[in-house]
């Protein structure tokens, strides 16, 4: 069927409110003639109907169940501005190359959402509707957030520009490392890793997502040893350093206590995990803003709902929500590392974090223009399976405003942690110098690294150990678009 040509079937007048069951199309949730307002929130869903279910009806059901509808007509609709508050599915397209899947464009009136609340937004657009029986699967692919709604959020407490000013580091990616092994180290040994990595040339070290307060190392002990390491490394190098102290805990009271202690010790940054939830993330963002702290977000748990192509929530949507919620850093993929990341899709994530305005770019998976209304920018973090030998590729794909985190690529160095950090710093400086000189650092990357390694034994060792190690697997989440040939002039 040609889903794009099906006309409105909305029942008008008294018949609309007769008791009984009525199709979602007839209840007014399918409005192909509707033109979205500048103030509408627009969602793009990938809808996979059950066999025999009309895709228009399935898409209208998504609109209804994520806004005002229930399974039967209710007379109390007449006590509301029902036609205004109904979400309106106004377009349904087949997904290119995916039989039985459809893109449904749904517009929501801004008054349906509480200002400045990610929890309220998500309770509607990814609430009960994802369990709706007539659907095999449902995925939220993208959203257009109107300026009127964006302005109700505070956004990142620090932002890229101010973070660079505080660190006094410009013109290059920042370097970091996640402490490994992620679990099992004592506080003293943990602090030793932090010191050696920072002294060797890194800007940051980082707790991993699941290091909180365990029997082998309580949080207070870790914070004390880490900040001793940071202070010693700063004194030794003359550079501002930091360590992402994970304050994730069982309750908000515990998290505030840990964050306050980190501040008292002089930390410039604290860390939280995505799994703490949207309300907790916004609460910690408010705390970070009041206390002039950088807020780092580890996206722990995201792949449980972002990785599958047909069901869940795209990470581009999570990126938008987190920019609104107010985090300064977010892990956003590496392209060449060990974790999921199609190159074009990942560039879309980075654009969402870093740009003031996102134009529609279907090849990057971005379906809508997005104006960020001067909201601070988020620093993306690339972490997971990267090493010095990939430096030219990382800069090519990810650009300059990014934190490159070499965990195993620092701590696994055969000459030790400090040497691993030095290898990464020298590789980065060599590549940035080549870029600034106007050289083709991408094609000349291996040559540039080899020349730098000739006078840097740690880098030479790193290149010998990891060579051209990469994780070359097909992505499960590539953009859905069909390139169109440009006619000859």
From Swiss-Prot:
Catalytic residues as annotated in Swiss-Prot or TrEMBL: 180 (proton acceptor), 298 (proton acceptor)
Q: Which PROSITE patterns match?
A: RUBISCO_LARGE
**UniProt enzyme class:** lyase
> What highest taxon heads this organism's lineage?
Bacteria
Catalytic reaction(s) noted: 2 (2R)-3-phosphoglycerate + 2 H(+) = D-ribulose 1,5-bisphosphate + CO2 + H2O; D-ribulose 1,5-bisphosphate + O2 = 2-phosphoglycolate + (2R)-3-phosphoglycerate + 2 H(+)
Q: Where does substrate bind?
A: 128, 178, 182, 299, 331, 383
Site (Transition state stabilizer): which residue positions?
Answer: 338
* Entry's cofactor comment: Binds 1 Mg(2+) ion per subunit.
Matches recorded under InterPro entries: RuBisCO, RuBisCo_large_chain_AS, RuBisCO_lsu_C, RuBisCO_lsu_C_sf, RuBisCO_lsu_fd_N, RuBisCO_lsu_N_sf, RuBisCO_lsuI
For this protein, the record's NCBIfam families field holds: PRK04208.1
What the protein does comes down to:
RuBisCO catalyzes two reactions: the carboxylation of D-ribulose 1,5-bisphosphate, the primary event in carbon dioxide fixation, as well as the oxidative fragmentation of the pentose substrate. Both reactions occur simultaneously and in competition at the same active site.
**HAMAP family from the entry?**
RuBisCO_L_type1
Query: Which family is this protein grouped under?
Result: Belongs to the RuBisCO large chain family. Type I subfamily.
Q: Additional info?
A: The basic functional RuBisCO is composed of a large chain homodimer in a 'head-to-tail' conformation. In form I RuBisCO this homodimer is arranged in a barrel-like tetramer with the small subunits forming a tetrameric 'cap' on each end of the 'barrel'.
| Protein name, UniProt field | Ribulose bisphosphate carboxylase large chain 2
> Gene of origin?
cbbL2
